[in-house]
Amino acid sequence: MTDEPLTDRPPAVDLGRLLIDAHAESDEHAVEAALRPRRLDEFVGQQRVRDQLSLILDGAKQRGRPPDHILLSGPPGLGKTTLAMIVAAELNTPIRVTSGPAIQHAGDLAAVLTQLSEGEVLFLDEIHRMARPAEEMLYLAMEDFRVDVVVGKGPGASVIPLELAPFTLIGATTRTGLLPGPLRDRFGFTARLDFYEPADLERIVHRSARLLDVRITPDGAAEIARRSRGTPRIANRLLRRVRDYAEVRADGVITCEVAQAALAVYEVDEHGLDRLDRAVLDALVRRFGGGPVGLGTVAVAVGEEPETVEEVAEPFLFRAGFLIRTPRGRMATAAAWRHLGITPPPEALGAAQLAFEIDRDAGEPTA
């Protein structure tokens, strides 16, 4: 599921980046909402998480009580928001949606919590970006369904406890490691969403094509799925752009050839890599000899913020086997060199393999 800063002169639009960035653009929210499944049995992929959620929801319905608080983690675009909506629908209860950046003070959180009705679902996106005072208030709310409101200042201040209606919090995060331990521990169920397999993405593309009344062949759906970086949101976005190409420059039917031609226009290659991805690999290989290089150095080399490189480009590059992380920084793999059409030197291959083995044997997070 990123806003560009305003400048005096509009920047050039990177069409490929708009397609591949899994953070939804505001003008696409309505279309994406229309394509979302409404029930758990309509949700494609993430079978393990679906089975676990089904058990939790069935148990809660049998007891007539709200389910435990739920934490959903994983890269953007994998269905965290959709699953939160589905949980509320399966429980036949309202859902209130907010986000961590919108909760900057304890009072902001108190205002939201005190408006919840019994059994309501509160979806808190980007929960890792919530302000610390609000986090501390949330501990008590999650555990005892109560908030303590401080009235007054100084020695004369008093604390007024406010009882809350029992509710279910669903938190979503792309950065689980940034959540304090006490907050993580208060979630009764934690699920990590993984990148999707091509077969599941093909099913998603076919379903979305039916909803959009788009004619598509099996190999056309497979081609779009193959370039979708394991992410349903990107698959749906690519489908809509390929549909435009099919209607304007072809006969309206999305075939493999039409999908390939359309995605070439948007500079999305056969692996789903776009201009930023290739810039990261190019910097690592051509400028730094394959690494190791720190995140900040890579970001400067490609002209992006470190957060953009880390959250948008790197997750899929790691998964696709183009990058590895070592205690000394990022390194390009042999696959990255070959993807750029360059034969990797033996010393680079040896260093990358050694770094990989060190990280694997250590069993510790790398830098």
From Swiss-Prot:
Where ATP binds, per the record, is at 35-36, 77, 80-82, 143-145, 186, 196, 233
**Where is the protein situated, by its record's location annotation?**
Cytoplasm
Which region ranges are annotated with the description Head domain (RuvB-H)?
270-367
Gene Ontology biological process terms in this record: DNA recombination; DNA repair
Region (Small ATPAse domain (RuvB-S)) spans which residues? Answer: 197-267
| One Gene Ontology cellular component | cytoplasm
Q: Which UniProt keywords apply?
A: ATP-binding, Cytoplasm, DNA damage, DNA recombination, DNA repair, DNA-binding, Hydrolase, Nucleotide-binding
| Keyword Ribosomal protein found | no
Q: Where is this region: Large ATPase domain (RuvB-L)?
A: 2-196
Q: So what does this thing catalyse?
A: ATP + H2O = ADP + phosphate + H(+)
- What is a GO molecular function of this protein? ATP binding
Q: What does this protein do?
A: The RuvA-RuvB-RuvC complex processes Holliday junction (HJ) DNA during genetic recombination and DNA repair, while the RuvA-RuvB complex plays an important role in the rescue of blocked DNA replication forks via replication fork reversal (RFR). RuvA specifically binds to HJ cruciform DNA, conferring on it an open structure. The RuvB hexamer acts as an ATP-dependent pump, pulling dsDNA into and through the RuvAB complex. RuvB forms 2 homohexamers on either side of HJ DNA bound by 1 or 2 RuvA tetramers; 4 subunits per hexamer contact DNA at a time.
Domain statement: Has 3 domains, the large (RuvB-L) and small ATPase (RuvB-S) domains and the C-terminal head (RuvB-H) domain. The head domain binds DNA, while the ATPase domains jointly bind ATP, ADP or are empty depending on the state of the subunit in the translocation cycle. During a single DNA translocation step the structure of each domain remains the same, but their relative positions change.
Q: What is this protein called?
A: Holliday junction branch migration complex subunit RuvB
